[in-house]
Amino acid sequence: MESTIGIDAGGTLTKIAYLNKKMQLAFEKVYSNEQNKIIDWLKNQTGIKQICITGGKAKQLQQLLSASYKIVELNEFEATLVGVRYILKKEKYDINNFVLTNIGTGTSIHYIYNDQYIRAGGTGVGGGTIMGLSKLLTNIDHFEDVIPLTKVGSRKELDITVGDIYGGILSPIDNSLTASNFGKAAITDSNYNSSDILATIQGLVGEVVTALSLQFAETKNIDHIIYIGSTLCNNIHLQNIISSYTKYQNKTPIFLRDGGNSGAIGALLYATNKKS
């Protein structure tokens, strides 16, 4: 049986969406610099005739695959939006207007109004920042190793909070808010363990991304912020940071199951609908 798959070739990860033998949506993830593994996986699948590719490395991957498969290319954000709409419907959300924050290697932020979207902005702070700083500060360079260590880490010895600055005096804002990420590292001589450093890195990234998302949401008076991206996958620590900060500013955070695969899902759906 002929089949179609969707591929989101990102800066760090390449995500693949396809229908398995039970005709259920399934996913694969491969590091984008391991293109031989992507090719090997495709060779092991039977009946693939068409591939819809999206993402920053789409052109590069297309050159490798075009001789063997029919290739359809789709704009990265169009693919992501199709995928997000599909997941929202599947998870029974009825939301038409929202801010969509996609935390990949970097972070992009869009306004969504029904079927229209406008790029609000973005930041170079994202998953690539987590991995880059993790490598520099702890010599840990695999996301799968970062997550469990982060879970047992604490930011108390590294971040300066508002409460630390005011020292028990009534402050104008919540004492638990971060005044300076990693600020204590400059004023103490402690040796910090890897878990605490990793937790603090994620705190920095989470707060920067959330603060920017909140500013955009407030500007347009939008209540819901949907956070997606592979950086959030199994990353409860980062989700909690983003969620608590978003709620503190009276906005509603939403984390979609399989949100990190939105682009690949959208590519699959686009190619499937176009084919039919």
Swiss-Prot record:
Main location: cytoplasm
Compartment(s) of residence: Cytoplasm
Keywords: ATP-binding, Coenzyme A biosynthesis, Cytoplasm, Kinase, Nucleotide-binding, Transferase
Alphabetized Pfam families for the sequence: Fumble (PF03630)
Annotated GO MF terms: ATP binding; pantothenate kinase activity
Enzyme Commission number, as recorded: 2.7.1.33
Family annotation (SUPFAM superfamilies): Actin-like ATPase domain
Pathway: Cofactor biosynthesis; coenzyme A biosynthesis; CoA from (R)-pantothenate: step 1/5
GO biological process terms held by the UniProt record: coenzyme A biosynthetic process
Positions contributing to ATP binding: 8-15, 105, 127-131, 143, 230
Catalyses which reaction(s): (R)-pantothenate + ATP = (R)-4'-phosphopantothenate + ADP + H(+)
Protein's UniProt name: Type II pantothenate kinase
Organism name: Bacillus anthracis
